[in-house]
Curated annotation (Swiss-Prot):
The chain crosses the membrane at residues 23-43, 90-110, 117-137, 141-161, 178-198, 203-223, 286-306, 315-335, 345-365, 374-394, 408-428, 435-455. It is a multi-pass membrane protein. GO terms for biological process: monoatomic ion transport. Glycans are attached at residue 70. GO terms for molecular function: transmembrane transporter activity. This is Solute carrier family 22 member 15-like. SUPFAM superfamilies: MFS general substrate transporter. PROSITE patterns: MFS. The keyword Transmembrane applies. One of its GO terms (cellular component) is membrane. Its main location: membrane. InterPro entries: MFS_dom (IPR020846), MFS_sugar_transport-like (IPR005828), MFS_trans_sf (IPR036259). It is found in: Membrane.
Length: 487
């Protein structure tokens, strides 16, 4: 039997896979806490300088500085105000730079060495550098530790997402992918709750990092991805993992015998360069990189342009996470419909997000009706969140197993560039107040239209090797499944 037939025999989403994927999706709470750490740890307290006619030296500012807040942050401890205020944003930028590097290197590394060892190593060092963050004796140590947390967190989270997908049958990839992103949004709200009760920034960083130990210890029982084992020629090992899953799913005396996987062996060399070497992957990668870049640009740009919410800091952080929750049931509904699928859902959500940005230009700020700029901006954020969710799932299905993590890593790298660029788009307001929303709108609409050039993957077999994508038999089977699904 081939791998997809084996999953049907074993159970595509049995009790064993539910435990494995449930554990890895809960890991996203830890990932979210690390990703959002700077929001509360770097919060700027209200402060008063009792003598504004002092020199610009830091020592003089400290003597005349007073604050009346009931929380601490790196700003209050290291007095990152006035000419040193930029250091908070610098630490945040270093974290995102680390994410970019982690996405680039961890993807190909896990395609070569295996998902499990790369994931475990990344999580271990993520925890180590997380404690360096909490115990940092100076801003410089804090900033460097945030960079390395970004490297490990971004790479580890990427590999754990792929593991979550590859533990289950292909028909459940949409569900597990959506759950991963849903729990991340819930994790943001959980971090806000921690911050509400823990007002000391060092204690907060320590507590937010500590669940990683729990996840690391339990992660040692995770098996290697059977899809990766099969794609690399470790057929016997893949059979053993599948038989273990079958036993966990209640199959009595399971016996799995896989066909040898054509086109690859344990010594096959696959790298990120395969994404440009083969034409079928080259154009997919170019289109996907642009789509990921736009998703990130519009998502973070809308967050900045919607304006800062007034009121309780911790409630605001929670709302920024929970506003994404409705995107996930919408995503699950549309991507499984024959008239929508992955491709049209991606296009639709991106186009809706783009038009929401453009329509914001024509609605007066003083409009008291239901349709106002804030509502349109939030609708745009909801739409682009749904697009982000679909794109994660869609990208996993477009790449064969042997280069799946490499493909996801390159796309995630493009995504980080969008996130880095998005804070600079609001500066375009100095030329025209409408220009940022025009830029976001055009980007969203163009990415939505270009996504229609990608092939649909709904109800199509997963390619294990690059040769699978190029074989006439695979293409014929894909068309046959598409016809059957539409009848």
């Amino acid at each position: 039997m081939d791998l997809d037939e084996a999953f049907l025999y074993v159970g595509e989403f049995g009790w064993c896979q539910k435990r494995l994927t449930g554990f890895l999706t809960l890991l996203q709470i830890y990932v979210a806490c690390q990703s959002m750490l700077i929001v509360l740890v770097g919060a700027v307290p209200e402060y008063l300088i009792d003598n504004e006619d002092i020199s610009t030296s830091k020592e003089d500012y400290i003597k005349h500085l007073h604050d009346a807040n009931n929380f601490t942050s790196i700003v209050s401890e290291w007095h990152l105000i006035k000419h040193e205020a930029y250091k908070v944003n610098l630490a945040s930028s270093l974290f995102f730079a680390g994410l970019l590097i982690g996405n680039v290197f961890f993807g190909p590394l896990s395609d070569k060495l295996g998902r499990r060892p790369v994931y475990l190593s990344g999580l271990f060092f993520d925890i180590i550098f997380g404690y360096f963050t909490a115990l940092a004796p100076s801003y410089e140590v804090f900033a460097v530790s945030r960079f390395f947390v970004g490297v490990m967190n971004g790479g580890m989270a990427l590999v754990s997402f792929v593991l979550t997908q590859e533990y289950v049958g292909k028909s459940y990839w949409a569900l597990t992918g959506s759950l991963t992103n849903l729990i991340f949004a819930v994790g943001i709200a959980f971090y806000a709750l921690l911050g509400f009760y823990i007002r000391n920034w060092r204690t907060l960083a320590f507590v937010a990092n500590s669940p990683g130990i729990f996840f690391l210890l339990l992660s040692f029982v995770l098996p290697e991805s059977p899809r990766w084992l099969y794609s690399r020629g470790y057929t016997a090992e893949a059979e053993a993992v599948l038989e273990s899953m079958a036993a966990g799913n209640g199959v009595e005396r399971p016996v799995v015998r896989l066909k040898s996987c054509p086109g690859t062996t344990a010594n096959s060399a696959h790298s990120v360069f395969d994404l440009v070497k083969y034409g079928v992957l080259r154009w997919r990668t170019i289109l996907l990189m642009y789509i990921w870049y736009v998703c990130s640009l519009v998502y973070y740009g809308l967050t900045l342009n919607a304006g800062e919410l007034k009121g309780n800091l911790y409630l605001n952080v929670a709302l920024y996470g929970l506003v994404e929750v409705p995107a996930f049931p919408l995503c699950l509904y549309f991507i499984e419909k024959s008239w929508s699928g992955r491709r049209r859902a991606t296009a639709g959500f991106l186009v809706f997000a783009g038009f929401a940005c453009i329509f914001t230009i024509f609605v007066p700020e003083t409009n008291g009706d239901f349709i106002n700029p804030t509502v349109l901006a939030l609708f745009g954020k909801l739409s682009v969140s749904a697009a982000f969710n679909v794109v994660y799932i869609y990208t996993s299905e477009l790449y064969p197993t042997v280069v799946r993590n490499a493909g996801l890593g390159v796309c995630a790298m493009a995504c980080r560039f969008g996130g880095i660029l998005s804070p600079f788009i609001p500066a375009m307001k100095s030329f025209n107040p409408s220009m940022p929303f025009v830029a976001f709108g055009i980007s969203g609409i163009s990415a939505g239209i270009l996504s229609l050039l990608l092939p649909e993957t709904r109800n199509k077999p997963i390619a294990e090797t690059i040769e699978d994508l190029q074989s006439p038999a695979y293409q014929l089977l894909s068309r046959g499944n598409e016809v059957l699904a539409s009848t």
